[in-house]
């Protein structure tokens, strides 16, 4: 301990999460957190005029379902939805705006050993950080965590002479509702292309994945900035390729071709339901996710008046909020503070063993 004269102390305080302190010894100056960040940010002042907040253009309102009745039930069966999933996972997320809680432990069989159908994301288990990269408290340190999702190429942010002059589009969350997704596609009308992620009996998954990769590469080289991977075309003749494989294949292929930074990979899938499924999709490279089947299943329960006084838009908002909170929790376990650092990082590991290796 060093004794100091209290009269010589100009200010007292402590560093909070994400804050820094600078000292310039030769000039005898101390710079607080705000001074340092203002100094660094002034180099990018012109970015303010280029940043466009998409949340203002894509509000959650006028939500509507896509499928209903027999079509919806067939899709739920196709993607492995059970009554337990709808009642114990989906319903609490919309009702309480947070993940459902249950007893400690998971005594279900590993997906690879199960004799029942299990979605591919069940084969993935979440990792957690070790001492070298401590976890973050997503509740108390939420100021340093963000789900902001950016569209557009920033170029090399370390090269002040070669910064992009294009607009930068930002969303506060990577989760898009059905109405938001429809407006999103319309907004990027000339710069988006949809790739069908279903295959028929004349194809196999490996050949379809190769086709999807090549199609994505061609679109990017043509100047497309928004690729949409969709399994909505599923039918009696068309079977969905697991979206995890599609995203992983496209993300890895474009990265190898040094094209990934020029495009966003947007996903429209019936697979996404709980926070783990969203986390795995983003973890293998998805930029945004539209869980159309989960939202339609939500509407099905809303029509049965199972949410009491809540309007459908409120149910959707609460569901999206619960997914966002779940993503922050999963990221915090790995000590990751922003979604862009989690995206494509593959911080989960898998128990899956395939007889034929498919490069994703």
Located regions from the model:
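Phosphate/diphosphate-binding loops
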Residues: 2-33, 256-292, 296, 300-343
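Extended, highly charged accessory segments
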Residues: 31-36, 40-198, 204-212, 217, ...
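A glycine-rich phosphate-binding loop feature that marks nucleotide/adenosyl-phosphate handling sites
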Residues: 140-146, 230-233, 268-275, 336-349
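Alpha/beta enzyme core
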Residues: 213-227, 279-280, 284-287
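Glycine-rich, proline-tolerant flexible connector loops at the mouths of alpha/beta enzymes
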Residues: 229-244
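Alpha-helix-loop-beta-strand connector modules within alpha/beta enzyme cores
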Residues: 242-261
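Conserved small/polar residues in nucleotide/adenosyl-binding loops
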Residues: 349-356
């Amino acid at each position: 301990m060093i004794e100091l004269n209290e009269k010589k102390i100009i200010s007292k305080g402590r560093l909070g999460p994400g804050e820094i302190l600078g000292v310039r010894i030769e000039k005898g100056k101390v710079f607080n957190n705000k001074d340092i960040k203002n100094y660094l940010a002034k180099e990018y002042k012109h970015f303010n005029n280029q940043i466009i907040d998409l949340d203002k253009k894509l509000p959650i309102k006028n939500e509507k379902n896509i499928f209903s009745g027999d079509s919806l039930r067939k899709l739920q069966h196709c993607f492995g939805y059970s009554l337990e999933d709808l009642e114990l996972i989906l319903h609490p997320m919309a009702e309480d705006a947070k993940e459902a809680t249950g007893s400690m432990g998971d005594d279900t069989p590993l997906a690879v050993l199960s004799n029942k159908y299990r979605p591919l994301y069940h084969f993935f288990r979440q990792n957690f950080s070790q001492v070298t990269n401590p976890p973050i408290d997503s509740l108390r340190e939420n100021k340093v965590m963000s789900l902001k999702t950016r569209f557009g190429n920033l170029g090399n942010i370390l090269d002040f002479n070669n910064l992009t002059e294009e607009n930068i589009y930002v969303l506060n969350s990577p989760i898009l509702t059905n109405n938001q997704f429809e407006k999103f596609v319309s907004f990027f009308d000339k710069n988006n292309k949809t790739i069908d992620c279903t295959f028929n009996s004349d194809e196999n998954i490996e050949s379809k994945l190769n086709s999807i990769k090549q199609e994505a590469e061609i679109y990017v080289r043509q100047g497309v900035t928004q690729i949409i991977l969709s399994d909505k075309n599923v039918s009696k003749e068309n079977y969905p390729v697991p979206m995890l494989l599609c995203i992983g294949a496209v993300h890895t292929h474009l990265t190898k071709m040094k094209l990934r930074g020029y495009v966003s990979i947007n996903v429209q899938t019936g697979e996404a339901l709980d926070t783990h499924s969203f986390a795995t999709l983003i973890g293998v490279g998805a930029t945004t996710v539209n869980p159309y089947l989960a939202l339609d299943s939500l509407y099905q329960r809303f029509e049965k008046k199972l949410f009491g006084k809540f309007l459908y838009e409120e149910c959707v908002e609460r569901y999206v909020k619960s997914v966002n909170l779940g993503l922050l929790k999963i990221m915090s376990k790995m000590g990751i503070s922003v979604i862009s650092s989690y995206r494509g990082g593959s911080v989960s590991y898998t128990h899956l063993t395939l007889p034929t290796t498919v490069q994703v």
